[in-house]
Amino acid sequence: MDLFYWLTVLRKKSEGLVMRISTADEVNYDTIAGPSESDIWDALVKLPVSYDSLYFTYGDKESPRFIFVEYENGKYRLEHDTEDLDTDMTNVARVSQDLARDILYHFAREHTVEIDEHWEQEKVR
């Protein structure tokens, strides 16, 4: 299956997308529920110099999914556990900043945020 196939699939889901930003000197994540495209872009740009990692989660508490993003060797390393990507694909990819942005924008558009008791445990902006 083509890598970009899932980018064209347009279906809204009721699960919420949450972005957590970690810095090397902090134990706690700064958490943003329903990050905007500008929130995601700012985090990607700052990742190589200011942040340690980005951690995106969505889904209900019975079946949460994640996308973990780190910057290493000039590429963005995305690790995922999501059924939205082709299951034949590896769950780790090293991609350019533009492709990382497109992937994360896709998830931000496709997953609406509905705060419930599962997410209320988070420090949400």
Residue locations for each model-derived region?
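Acidic, proline/glycine-rich low-complexity IDRs
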Residues: D2-R125
